[in-house]
Amino acid sequence: GQRVANLATKMYLSDYPDAHEVSRIVAIIQTGSYLHDTIDEKICEDPSKVISEIEELLPKIGFTELEAQDILFTIQHMSFSANIEHHYQLPLSGQYVQDADRIESLGAIGIARAFTYGGKHGNKIYDPKIKPEKLISHDQYRNHVETTINHFYEKLFDLEGLMNTPAAKKEAHRRTEYMREFVQEFMDEWNV
């Protein structure tokens, strides 16, 4: 949504200071940012129907066929789960959308989101008997038993190393350090 679009645009303009904020690539980045969650399997019952609707919409709002292909490829191949078994190389615009979406999972907002998601799905906050797993398949990622603290070790701490762009690498590092401090404090308090 809005934060992903703002962050993706800000990072692109940081990496390309001579670019204009009202350029074609910025329009592609922002459109991809707004559309990226519309086909998320966690919230969308029929992704193929939504993809068809987006395919019809993009030319009507002024995108060329190539630009529309970039947007569609990005939103279909940018998710963490889509890249567990195979890494997809996204167009430059898509790299900024993917990085911004992943950065949303980091830092203070990422911590809040992790605990909100865990609570909503009935996950334990922490259980020392449940060890973090190395996630190697989409099915394992979607179906394994996890705790919220394990989610930091199984996914969130790894996102920093998956960033594509210079500005994202810098921001991801800053937010990951904050999360590491939080998890260390949590473990110190847990083990009193």
Regions found by a protein language model. Give the residues of each.
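Residue-level detector of well-ordered alpha-helical segments, enriched
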Residues: 25-30, 67-71, 107, 152
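Alpha-helical phosphate/pyrophosphate-handling elements in metalloenzyme active cores
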Residues: 1-29, 41-42, 57-61, 82
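Helix-adjacent hinge/juxtasegments
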Residues: 48-94, 103
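His-Asp-centered metal-binding catalytic motifs of divalent-metal-dependent phosphohydrolases/nucleases
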Residues: 22-44, 50, 72-81
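Divalent metal-dependent phosphate-bond-processing catalytic cores, especially two-metal-ion Mg2+/Mn2+ enzymes
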Residues: 2, 6-21, 35, 86-192
